[in-house]
C-alpha cells in the first residue's frame, strides 16, 4: 500500500529494503480511508526509525537524511525503478534547517526542572505524474446547445475538484 510505497523511496541509496505492516482495528477511531490514507502512517514509521538510527549512530538526524535522501536524477528502486526527474528534497531540507535555526537548537538541552528544549525533523515527498502509475486525462466537448461537457477521470473526495475543474472549464 501507500504506507511503504510513499515512504521508502525517500532514501534512494538503500540497496535493500523491506516494509511490512499489520492493519489493526480498534474501538478508538474510524478505520476508513481518508485523504492521504496510508502515506502519512508509513512516513511516521520510517522517519521515526531514521531518527532512532541517527541517535544510535550519534549522528545529526539532518545529516543522516542529507547523506541518504533521493535527489533529482536518481533512480528510486523502491518506486518501480523510476527516476526522480523533479525532486527538491535537498533544497527543502537545507531551507528548513536554516529557517528553524537547526544548528543553534540541536542537540536538545536540559533546561533543569524537568524541562528539555529541542527540535525534531522528518521529511516527506509526494510523487505526481509518475509514468505508468499516476496517469490521467481530461476532455472537453462543446454541446449542440452551446454548453460544455467536461469529461474527467476523477471523483471529488472532499478536495473540491468538482468546483475547481468546472471553474477552469
Predicted ranges, named:
Residues 41-45, 49-60, 92-103, 164, ...:
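Stable alpha-helical structural segments in soluble proteins, enriched in small hydrophobic residues
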Residues 60-68:
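Short, well-structured alpha-helical segments that form the helix of a local strand-helix-strand
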Residues 37-40, 51, 55-56, 79-87, ...:
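Generic amphipathic alpha-helical segments used as scaffolds and interaction surfaces in large
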Residues 10, 40, 61, 76-77:
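Proline-rich low-complexity regions
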Residues 68-147, 167:
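Helix-loop-helix junctions that connect adjacent transmembrane helices in secondary transporters/permeases
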Residues 1-42, 113-169:
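Gly/Pro-rich active-site capping loops and adjacent beta-alpha segments
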Amino acid at each position: 500500500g501507500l504506507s511503504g510505497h510513499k515512504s521508502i523511496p525517500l532514501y534512494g541509496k538503500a540497496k535493500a529494503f523491506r516494509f511490512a505492516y499489520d492493519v489493526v482495528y480498534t474501538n478508538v477511531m474510524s478505520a476508513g480511508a481518508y485523504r492521504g490514507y496510508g502515506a502519512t502512517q508509513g512516513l511516521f514509521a520510517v522517519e521515526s526509525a531514521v531518527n532512532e538510527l541517527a541517535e544510535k549512530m550519534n549522528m545529526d538526524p539532518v545529516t543522516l537524511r542529507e547523506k541518504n535522501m533521493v535527489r533529482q536524477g536518481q533512480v528510486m528502486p523502491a518506486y518501480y525503478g523510476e527516476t526522480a526527474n523533479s525532486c527538491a528534497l535537498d533544497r527543502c531540507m537545507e531551507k528548513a534547517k536554516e529557517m528553524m535555526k537547526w544548528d543553534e537548537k540541536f542537540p536538545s538541552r536540559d533546561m533543569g526542572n524537568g524541562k528539555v528544549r529541542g527540535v525534531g525533523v522528518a521529511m516527506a515527498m509526494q510523487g505526481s505524474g509518475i509514468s505508468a502509475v499516476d496517469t490521467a486525462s481530461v476532455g472537453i466537448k462543446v454541446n449542440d446547445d452551446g454548453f460544455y461537457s467536461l469529461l474527467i477521470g476523477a471523483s471529488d473526495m472532499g478536495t473540491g475538484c468538482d468546483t475547481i475543474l468546472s471553474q477552469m472549464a
